[in-house]
């Protein structure tokens, strides 16, 4: 077999021939997913030339995944590792030549070795309920962006990110149920990041979530003429377009420039932690694959919250 030229060729070859990536092997699916991110999110896609891999290109790619796809550093390291795995597997199999080891991203053996990110605990940017209300009002009244305002309120009070709320159709919204709920991942064709993301978002009558979201959901359902149309996703051309409008309001309100739409999902989990919702319940409500991810929100409790918890202790506890 002649030397491979493009990323797509290398990826296909690795998926076909690498034993660790076969369907029966544990970890094969996420490894392929992380590697495939490069096909989806670099401008040339699968046609990207292997000869063009270098340090500067990888840093740009990872920066864009972090900023525009809002991936965590640990996830980004998985992406780096599995790009490297694809390229080095092809070298090991003799279908890709050893590389020029004068470059810093090439080992002495002529294989690829890209620098991974140093994992540091980043402070989470979150909003208070009052700030969410302020954001909603500014988006709706100052920018005439009611659709943006709706998604901000929805995300903050449900923990739904773009990938989930942009897929919602009328069939996912059950306002006439004894306890109204939003079904996430129950409908055929609803794409989930992991199976853990399949869940129901309940809106108990009289709760703040109910009072905030019922008018929004009812209004959007009434304006939906097609039961298969995406209630919120069709209001924006893309996730990037949604983010641009979000950033306009964020900057107008002089909020932290690191605040992104995905921070509203962090906001929801932080509210749960601040209200002492049991971690097991929060884990299910968020749809996290790992309890460790949920527990990270419970390690950012400040002294005032600890004091308030002590104040609730009684002899009847």
Q: What are the functions of these language-model segments?
A:
Residues 77, 81, 92, 105-162, ...:
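Basic, Lys/Arg- and aromatic-enriched nucleic-acid-binding interface segment
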Residues 132, 204-256:
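Active-site/catalytic core of tyrosine-dependent DNA strand-transfer enzymes
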Residues 167-212:
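Conserved tyrosine-mediated DNA breakage-rejoining catalytic core shared by Y-recombinases
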Residues 188, 286-311:
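Catalytic-site neighborhood detector that most strongly recognizes the C-terminal catalytic loop/helix
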Residues 51, 113-137, 190-205, 225-226:
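DNA breakage-rejoining catalytic core of tyrosine-based enzymes
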Residues 2-70:
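Basic/aromatic-enriched alpha-helical hairpins
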Residues 34-41, 69-111, 161-163:
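N-terminal DNA-binding recognition helix of tyrosine site-specific recombinases/integrases
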Residues 173-179, 277-297:
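Short, polar N-cap/turn motifs at the start of nucleic acid-interacting alpha helices
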């Amino acid at each position: 077999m002649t030397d491979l030229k493009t990323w797509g060729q290398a990826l296909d070859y690795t998926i076909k021939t690498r034993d660790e990536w076969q369907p029966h092997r544990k970890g094969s699916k996420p490894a392929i997913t992380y590697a495939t991110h490069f096909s989806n999110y670099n401008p040339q896609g699968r046609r990207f030339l292997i000869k063009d891999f270098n340090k500067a290109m990888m840093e740009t790619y990872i920066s864009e995944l972090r900023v525009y796809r809002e991936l965590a550093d640990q996830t980004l390291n998985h992406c780096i590792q599995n790009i490297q795995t694809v390229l080095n597997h092809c070298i090991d199999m003799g279908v890709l030549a050893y590389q020029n080891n004068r470059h810093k991203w090439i080992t002495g053996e002529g294989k690829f070795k890209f620098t991974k990110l140093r994992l540091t605990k980043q402070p989470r940017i979150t909003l208070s309920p009052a700030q969410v209300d302020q954001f909603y009002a500014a988006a709706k009244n100052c920018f005439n962006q009611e659709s943006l305002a709706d998604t901000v309120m929805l995300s903050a009070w449900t923990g739904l990110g773009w990938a989930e709320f942009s897929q919602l159709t009328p069939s996912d919204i059950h306002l006439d149920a004894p306890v109204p709920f939003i079904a996430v991942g129950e409908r055929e064709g609803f794409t989930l990041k992991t199976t853990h993301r399949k869940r129901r978002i309940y809106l108990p009558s009289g709760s703040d979530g109910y009072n905030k979201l019922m008018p929004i959901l009812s209004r959007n359902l009434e304006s939906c003429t097609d039961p298969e149309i995406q209630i919120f996703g069709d209001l924006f051309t893309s996730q990037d377009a949604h983010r641009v409008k979000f950033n306009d309001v964020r900057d107008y309100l002089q909020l932290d420039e690191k605040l992104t739409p995905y921070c509203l999902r962090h906001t929801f989990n932080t509210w749960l932690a601040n209200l002492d919702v049991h971690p097991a319940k929060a884990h299910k409500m968020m749809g996290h694959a790992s309890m460790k991810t949920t527990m990270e929100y419970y390690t950012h409790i400040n002294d005032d919250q600890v004091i308030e918890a002590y104040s609730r202790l009684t002899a009847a506890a």
